[in-house]
A protein has these predicted regions:
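C-terminal regulatory/effector modules of DNA-binding transcriptional regulators
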Residues: 13-17, 44-47
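C-terminal accessory extensions appended to soluble enzyme cores
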Residues: 15, 79-149
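Acidic, metal-coordinating catalytic cores used for nucleic-acid/nucleotide bond scission
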Residues: 25-38, 59-65
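Two-metal-ion acidic nuclease core segments, chiefly of the RNase H-like superfamily
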Residues: 38-54
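RNase H-like two-metal-ion nuclease catalytic core shared by retroviral integrases
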Residues: 55-77
């Protein structure tokens, strides 16, 4: 996810130069607010780009509220009956679908990540001091401050 954010950031910054990004996330383990590398990369991104990041997680089993789930449904209908025989075919079909009258921005993110890499407990404690977990919903609402106006 951070790779995609880094890829899209120049376009986003040119359009509106935001000082806050709101990211709505599902509860998948790969983007958990307890994943050390995920939080580390988001903190680095926020600081390097002078932007605050507000992460809000959808509750478990509430995919009906998550717009990306509706996009997946449209994409599945769009490529129904197609043989997904290559990455190029999948990307091409994704680029030609329409959702709410718009074509999505589709890019292939290249990257291979080593498994089992995590921050030390001390490094994670240091990171925890740079983020704010909203009281009462600590797992589902996290603010990362990087904007220095």
């Amino acid at each position: 996810m951070v790779d995609a954010l880094e890829s899209l950031w120049p376009m986003i910054k040119t359009r509106s130069d935001p000082h806050t990004i709101v990211i709505n996330l599902d509860n998948g383990p790969e983007n958990s607010s307890r994943r050390t590398q995920f939080i580390n990369r988001l903190v680095q991104f926020a600081k390097e780009n002078n932007v605050d990041i507000n992460q809000t997680y959808y509750p478990p089993y509430h995919s009906k509220y998550n717009p990306i789930e509706r996009v997946w449904g449209v994409l599945e209908k769009h490529w129904k009956g197609e043989l997904l025989t290559s990455v190029e075919k999948v990307l091409g079909l994704a680029r030609t679908m329409k959702w709410n009258g718009k074509n999505p921005i589709v890019t292939k993110i290249q990257g291979v990540y080593k498994k089992g890499i995590s921050l030390s407990q001390k490094a994670m404690r240091d990171l925890e001091n740079m983020i704010i977990r909203v009281p009462g919903i600590e797992k589902w609402a996290v603010d990362i401050w990087g904007y220095e106006g």
